[in-house]
Curated annotation (Swiss-Prot):
This is Lactate utilization protein C 1. Belongs to the LutC/YkgG family. Is involved in L-lactate degradation and allows cells to grow with lactate as the sole carbon source. One of its GO terms (biological process) is lactate metabolic process.
Amino acid sequence: MMAIQNREEFLLQLSEKLGRKRPEAVEKPKWSFSPQWNVFDGLAQDELVLQLMEHCEVIHTEVKRTTKENLVETLGSLIKEWNIKSAMYSNDERFNEYGLTSCFNNEGTTHFRAWGLGDKEEDIKFAKAADLGITFSDMTLAESGTVVLFNDGLKGRHVSLLPESYIAIVPKSTIVPRLTQATKLIHNQSKAGENLPACVNFVSGPSNSADIEMNLVVGVHGPIRTAYIIVDDQ
């Protein structure tokens, strides 16, 4: 790591030009207003679901709503509709909890592979060629239609990034108003000394890029097609 040269002299000179002593410590400001907490404040969970679904239309993301009992059927219908031949899913206990793992083992013509159970390079190779990646959302932001993924060694980022299409399974209980609640949770985990995810990813629909003339190109940096399956788990 490179040494920082002349830092003290620079900061002292800067403080002098500002007409004050150099601060010895940094104190967090006490904000007079915090409007970010007012967005969707007081909405019931079902109302947040409607806000999420409404914004998904803006970000070109298909939405299905189902129950835990009907999740296998709902996911299976999307897989059939999209003509999925190969799919990778994250190594997440919720796939067992929601009864999906047994479905993957008996899905006929579609080849499923779980991330993190074999060689990592083979996982990446499979993900690159896969038609579909499937993960659960850890938090879901209604305002922006964003799924938040707390990734680690068993829940690799490649699952939601490399395949051609992506499906996020969104338990209704994970839906919060906006980014404010997600960053607050991560901050509290850090403050409490808890282990943080190796990587936190925010996914808002399919990959979108635009040039200076605002010509939209989908799929350059990730999946070209995305769907959220909202599961009534409450």
